[in-house]
Regions:
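N-proximal low-complexity "stem/linker" segments adjacent to membrane-targeting elements
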Residues: 1-23
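Hydrophobic/aromatic residues located in beta-strands of well-ordered beta-sheets
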Residues: 6, 33, 61, 90, ...
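Short beta-strand/loop segment that forms part of the nucleotide-sugar
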Residues: 8, 30-40, 62-63
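Acidic helix N-cap motif at the loop->helix transition within catalytic regions
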Residues: 15-19, 42-51
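Short, acidic, metal-binding catalytic loop of nucleotide-sugar glycosyltransferases
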Residues: 22-31
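Acceptor/aglycone-binding surface of glycosyltransferases and processive sugar-polymer synthases
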Residues: 64-81, 101-167
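Short beta-strand-to-loop acidic/aromatic patch adjacent to the donor-nucleotide binding site
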Residues: 86-98
Length: 167
């Protein structure tokens, strides 16, 4: 059984899902995937069902009745990963390749000594894809504010590419 499950919230990601799942399932460490689809009209949910049938126990498709938002998609995915699948590590990422799956083995290795690993956009070697200047500006402002007000050391407190240890 997979110890690490990747939660991938989706809405209209039919153009990306097959390639993303191929890359995730080809990684070492027997990665599992939980696709949380918000009733995508482009067939993303049906694609997730197909993958679930091909890889039972490694791919799960969760279907929600409407576009309910990213936060609740993560909650649904975490509930599945923790309470039903028994994942030891849970990773969150976007389906649009703004987070590169090739970094996941490094994140897993780091998680052996850290409880949370953040795939930061704002460290040497990091970067952004598919983001407008306004979104990057707002993200940097939010991160600066979080560090200043809360004393956080993390460079990218708003990153969606994260790995959490269950414990």
């Amino acid at each position: 059984m997979s110890e690490t499950f990747v939660i991938v919230p989706t809405y209209n990601e039919a153009d990306n899902l097959d390639e993303l799942l191929e890359q995730l399932l080809a990684l070492p460490d027997q990665i599992g995937v939980i696709v949380v689809d918000d009733n995508s009209p482009d067939g993303t949910g049906d694609m997730a069902d197909r993958w679930e049938g091909l890889y039972p126990g490694r791919v799960y498709a969760l279907h929600r009745p409407a576009k309910l938002g990213l936060g609740t998609a993560y909650i649904a995915g975490f509930n599945k990963a923790i309470h039903e699948v028994g994942a030891e590590r849970i990773l969150t990422m976007d389906a649009d390749f703004s987070h590169n799956p090739r970094y996941i083995p490094d994140m897993i290795a780091l998680s052996r000594s850290k409880h949370v690993v953040i795939g930061s956009r704002y460290v040497p070697g990091g970067g952004t894809r598919n983001c407008t200047r306004k979104r990057i500006y707002l993200s940097r402002l939010a991160n600066f504010t979080a560090r200043a007000l809360l004393g956080l050391k993390a460079k990218d407190a708003t990153a969606g590419f994260r790995l959490y240890r269950r414990e």
